[in-house]
Structures are given as C-alpha cells and as structure tokens.
Amino acid sequence: MADYLAGFYPEWVDKEENPRQIILDLGKMITNRIPVKLGFQKLNKYDPEYWGLAALLTDEQAEVALKMGVRKPKTMADMVKLTGKSEEELEKILGDMSFMGILEYNWENPTRTKQWVLPMFVPGSAEFTNMNDTILKKYPEMGRFFERMSRLPLEKVTPMVPPGGAGIGMHVIPVEKAIETENQSISVEHISHWLDKYEGKYAASPCSCRKSRLTFDEGCADDPEGWCVAVGDMADYVVETGKGGRYITKEEALEIFRKGEENGFVHQITNIDGADKIFAICNCNINVCYALRTSQLFNTPNLSRSAYVARVEKGDCVACGKCVEVCPAGAVKLGQKLCTKDGKQVEYPKHPLPSEMKWGPHMWDENYRDNNRINCYDTGTAPCKTACPAHIAVQGYLKMAAQGRYTEALALIKKDNPLPAICGRICNRRCEDACTRGSIDQAIAIDEVKKFIAQQDLDAETRYIPKKVVPSLNGSFSEKVAIIGAGPAGLSCAFYLAEKGYSPVIFEKNEKPGGMLRYGIPSFKLEKDVIDAEIDIIKAMGVEIKCGIEVGKDVTLDELRAQGYKAFYIAIGCQGGRKAGIPGEDAEGVMTAVDFLRTVGADESYPVTGKAVVVGGGNVAIDVARAAQRCGAESVAMFCLEPRDKMPASEEEIAEALEEDVTIDCGWGPKEILTENGRVTGIVFKRCVSVWDKDGKFAPAYDENDTKTVPCDRVFLSIGQSILWGDLLKGSKVELGRGNGAVADSLTYQTAEPDIFVGGDVYTGPKFAIDAIAAGREGAISIHRFVQPHSSLTIGRNRREFIALDKDNIKVEQYDNASRQIPGTRKDVDHKKSFRDAKLPFTEEQVKAETARCLGCGASVVDPNKCIGCGVCTTKCEFGAIKLHRERPECSNMIPSEKKLPYVLGNGAKQALKIKFSKKKEQ
C-alpha cells in the first residue's frame, strides 16, 4: 500500500504563478528533510514546507523568522538588533506569529527574560498551528501540513535511529504504576518526575494530532480538547496565544493521565531537548497520533519505545484479550498455552527489526492502524472465546469465579455482553460446543457458571453497573442518538453508548422493553424479572426507554432529526411470523409461532384446548410446543421436515420437550389445513424426501402421494419469521435485501442512509440473542464514530476476528476425566405445567468444581520486537499476568535534537556492519 496521503496541496497553490522565494528559503531553513537540508533537493510550491508557511506568513514575517534561526532563542533586544525594527513593530509581528503557532516563547534564561523561538516543524509549529481553532478553521490545509511534516523528514532516517530516539520527536513514557516496583528505573522514566520538575506550571491543551486528522476525515471520535498537558513555560504559551490551553493543578493533570489510561491512550513526552527538559506530556491515540506513527508505519520501534518491555506470565494469563485490544503496537496477541501432541509449546514469530536486515519501504506498514488490531496468531487461541459471537472472555471469568471474584467476573463479562443473566438462561452455547474440554469428557458448563455470576444483577444490592469510560475530559457527549427497538441488539447498543458517555433514547412500540426476549421467549425459560433487572441496570446508566411509541407511525425519522437526533440504530427484530402458503392456514385456530408466544408472553392464562400441532423443528417450535402444554393442550405433536439428527433445535431443547410428553414426527411438511365452518379440524402432511439440494441450500422436495392426516384443534406454524417495517423507513434511502432485511455494511452496519445503522435480526434474519448483542456493541462503536464529525468508521477498528486453536493437536492424555456439574431443579415447580423457571443456578460448590475443569487453553503472547513499553496493557489486566520489565535502559538516553546526526549515522553504520557480517555467516 503506497502513501495514500501523498501529493496533497491546497487548490490555491496551482494559481500561484511565482512562488515566494523568501518562503522557500524559510522552509529550507526549518525543514529536517535531509535531501533538502543538504541541497540535493530543491523545494517548490507543491512541497508542504512551502504551502504550509505561505498560507500564514507575510514576507515581512518570513524575513523576521529567517533572521532568528531555528531553535535559537531571541530576546526583544536581540530581535531589535537583528531586524532593525522597533520594539513596537516587533511586538505585533512576534505576537501575530506566536498566535499563528509559527513562533513559541519562553523565559528559560538566568534573568527570566521573555525570549522568542522559531521551532522546528515537528514537534513545533506544525502542532501549534493545529491547536489554534481560528487558524485551523481559516486554513484547514494546516492539518495536512502537520501530517506531511511528521512523516517526510523521517522516511530516509528511521531505520538508523538508535534506542532513545536520538532527539527526534516524542518518546513513550510508561504508565507510572507499571514501573513502581522496578528498582532500576531512573527519574526521566516517571511522569511524576516531570510534574515535580515543573511544579505549578501545567496547562491542559488540545491534541494537535486529533485535530489535524479531523481536517481530512480520519478522526478517531475522541474529544480532542485537553489531552496534551503543557508544562513549564509552554503552559503559559498555550494559554496566552489562542491554543486552547487552560491552567490546571497537579491533581487535575494526574486525573487527565488516569482518564487517558482508562481509554487506552499512550503517554508520550517531547524528546528534543535532552534529559533536562520537556514541554509536554501527551495522551495519544494510536489511530491518529503522528508521533506513534513514526515507529508503527516505518516498523522502527526505536522512534517510540521506552526502556521497558511487557512480559506475560503464562500461568497467570487467562486470554481475556483486554491487553490485546489496547496495545498500540500490536505487540500482544492471543495464543495458546496448551502443549501440542508432541509435547512442545507453540513457538511464536518475532517481528524483524532494521538492526537485522536491510530496511526500506517494503518493510513499512501503511495499514498499521488496522494490522495492529489483529487479535491472535494464526495458530489460534481459546476456542470458547473464538466461537462466542460476542467473543466474551470466557476463560477469564471462569478463573475469576474459581477465585471467588464474582463481581469482577461480572464486570469482565459485561465488557462484551451487557445481558449475562439473560444469556445464562437462553444462550445456544456455541462456546460449549467449541470447548476443548469436550475432547476429553464433557464441555465446561460455561453458561451455568455465567448464570451463577450474573445472579448478582437480580438484586439491587449486588448488581454491577459499569463505570463509564469516556474519551472526553468533559465526562460525556451531548449528541442525541435514537435506538428503535428494545430487544437484545437495541439494549446492547444503548448500553455501550451509555458506557461511552452518551444518553441514548430507545423507542419501543410495545408496552414494555425487551423485544423478543420478553414477547418471544416463554417465562419457563426466561423469567420476566430477569429481563427487568438487566434493563434496570441499563436505565441506571442513563438510557431512557420510551415505550408505546412506534417510529414511523407515532413519530417519523425526520421528526426525530428535527428534535436533534444525530444517528439512529434500528433493531426492531423479526416480529412477524411466516405462513406456509397452504390451504386453510387462515382458519380460526391457526397461529404463527411469533403471535402465539407474544400472546402467551403477555397473558400466561391464554387457553389452548384440544389437540395441538406445531409445524417446525427449531428451538422456537420447541418453545411453542412446551408453552402449548402449559396452556392446557390435550396433546402436543411436532412435525418437521428434517430427520431427527438434523433438526435445528438443540439436543437439550428436544430432550426437554420429549420429557414433557411432546411427540416429534420427522420428515413431514404441511400440505393442507383441514377446516369445518372456518375452524381447524386437522392438518395433512406430505412426506419430505430431502431438505437440501446438492449444494446444501434449503430446497425441500416431497412425495405428494405419501401423506398423513392428523386431527387437531390448533395449529401453530413455526416455519420462520418476518420483518414488519410499517412506515419506519418511509422516505429514507435504506435499501432492503434478502428476506426484506436491511442492507448495510458488514463491518459498520451503516445503511445507504448515512445516519441510520441497523443490527440484530433486522439485518441478519432470525438468529440468537447473543448474535444480536454482539451486533449492538458494534453498532455503538459505529454510531460513536459517526456522530463525532469527520471521524472514520473503520480505521483502527477491531474486526473481532479470532481463530480457534487446533484441538486435534493438543496433548490431552495428561488430563483426568471430571464429571460436568448438573444444575438442580426447584421442587416447588411442576416443570411440565408451570410457567415458572424450574432450573436452579449452580451452588458455589458446583461453581468451584466446574471451573476447576477448565484447561486454560489460551494466553496472551508478547512480541518484544514490537513492544514499545507503554504499559497500557498492564492497566487492563485483572490477573497481574502482564508486567513491564526494564530490559532496554539505553532507550532512556535523551539527547538534544541538535546532536542527533552523529547518533543516527553512528547507529546506522553499526547496523549496516552487523547485517553485512550476519549475511556472511549465513553464506
């Protein structure tokens, strides 16, 4: 992938016939591009050094700057002598140039006399111009100017940069808590050292990288204000010259750093003045930061890395993946800790370094922001996390439960699933299907453990309400978001938006929220108080739910837009049933499964008399059959197309139905419903000879002559669901596709109407609650990025793609068999007739026994060649499994920028010799 941002210049440049020589001269003086500096390359009007300065400076201002020299402080007396201008003239010129960001000033001399400095472009004037809203609004090209000047000077030198960064740009400083116990640490490695050094002189100022990226629609959706903490005289400069600075206390600075760590931001300090001076401590987002880009794009970690390397204690790691999600360098990925069949540990590759081989553009990674979000190695990781649509940290919460850390376990689950008590009762348990333990005896009862953990949410005293983690120092976002539908996808989207600092409003057409959780799943599987408890938590997070409002009928999308809503998440599910298209299906006594379950969900006393027939073989059909039994049916018989071993319903669901005296007859499809006086009297089935065609597509074939007539009084059709749009999309650009579902981008869920996103069954067709929950989380991410103007919906986004380890290549002989725990049943409930849930949660003893069966398949693996020693990973680990170690003390060698050339060239020569002799040895 080439440099896709290359070649930009403002439109006005083409119209300028004669470039201003004084600007070309100034650009050459300031730039750090070596070919330009040495005269091998001449600047022209299309170079950023030219148009970036030409946009702002008059010839008079440029002449003053040329006389100052780069990074050579000048007092007013010096400036008068240099320019021959009066103090009054210079006050205006220097003031204007300081406001623009072309000059900075300080009082760093023995007499504390104010002095002006012409800084380098980066770090320097490129940042300062982007911090000034007035300048950036008038000259948006300055955003691209900063982007270019943070890259072009480095392209030729990056492979040669020695540890410590050689006074180039910025430098990672680790999370202080991560190195508190490191006895060998030195002062410059501690944020507290720099705060103490500049005691009382701090200012919170905007992040110039975040603001720059916004000018070309590559924002990261963070609020850019306040993340850069200026220290010393720079604090005065950013406050006094329109750079958005505000004075803060030391405590406020520490709070900014804490919030930065919560958000996974990397601390960096300026690194151009040696070990005795910095002027800013930044909290950097890898998706926009140009300083971090220097190491990540060029694959040259010396430009960023601290003296520390993260290491994982495999025995303590549970492969939750939270360190992986925040690692800015993609240095941590999920792997496995189980041995392969030959008894060996899996060996993981290390990233090549410029000290090991010839470097160049072929080794760069233009797509580093996406590639650094790859979650696991190709050899795979824990199958449970991989198989779960929400990719919950199963291994992690099992370990926490084993340790009795139940609240922490619940918190860990809610990072990926806001409805664990619900899912603990109704999930289709793909994690258990994939569980490695199943290769030995039986899979871990993962969902039962989750159900036990989530019982805390059913009690207001013990429920867990997540803390908000907001990428804004304001603590919240004001943009209004409407969610249409209070089912699992809508609730999940609302939860994660609230956690991010929004106050979304859910519009639900039914009387109560929950969607198909409430109106499509019988209470003997999912009690209503469980639904209510988890929804109450979402409300407590600041989500408003307006029931009894049908969008499209009671209020339109355009009316909501007029009320200030900036984005919409449509998650109305598949609320309609499907009929079979056969004679008699409109007779009295025929209902679709969806209609029947909705009726029973609202009124459990609804009567079903006589003989009932259920057409269908999925889990919904099982729910209908069992509900019909409880509603008083004389008998219930199920008929389905599939053979017994191919039924869509789970084995557990089928077993429960059979135990409740439901009969199941396989291999039949409906042909006709018999009626008398408009009412059902029976149903005729025809033999299904095949369900799928040779390509595996659903295409049932029948023997029309082989029929069966079944007398009955009620027929329930459980053969599919449909989407009931009503007038919701009236006047919108949303396109509909297969099954009348919304067409949307598969990553962002954005539709053809940019402010409308979709998720859950309305996009995928009928699936499971956990699929909708996973979609809701992704919808929240997209909406957050969308409503923050000029942000990218995709750059640096975690695709949530995982690979399961090879269970056939695991050494399992070392493990003893251990029986799976079975939950108890309530003695006070007739499990065949009652609508109450008869299943008990595990006891604490059962949880201990069951979690002990976990093999602990996965673990995080650090590539030390990619690690930049920021310590962000340590802030996310709940097990103390990943720690920083001071293995690269040379990376704390800070030198002034003016001395960089000997260090860079010396290291380059040293590397070249090493590579040369390495090749000779190989030969």
State each model region's role:
Residues I392-Q395, A401-A402, A443-D447, I483-V551, ...:
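Beta1-alpha1 glycine-rich phosphate/pyrophosphate-binding loop at the start
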Residues I453-G475, K500, A533-D554, G577-C631, ...:
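Glycine-rich dinucleotide-binding loop and its adjacent helix/turn
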Residues K85, W116, Q268-I281, L297-V326, ...:
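Ferredoxin-like iron-sulfur electron-transfer modules
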Residues A329-P383, L398, I444-K480, E499, ...:
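Flanking helices and flexible, charged tails adjoining ferredoxin-like Fe-S electron-transfer domains
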Residues R112-R151:
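Short, amphipathic alpha-helical interaction segments positioned at domain boundaries
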Residues V624, V762-V787:
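A conserved FAD-binding loop/helix module that cradles the flavin
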Residues S98-N109, V332-K333, I882:
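A short, conserved structural fragment
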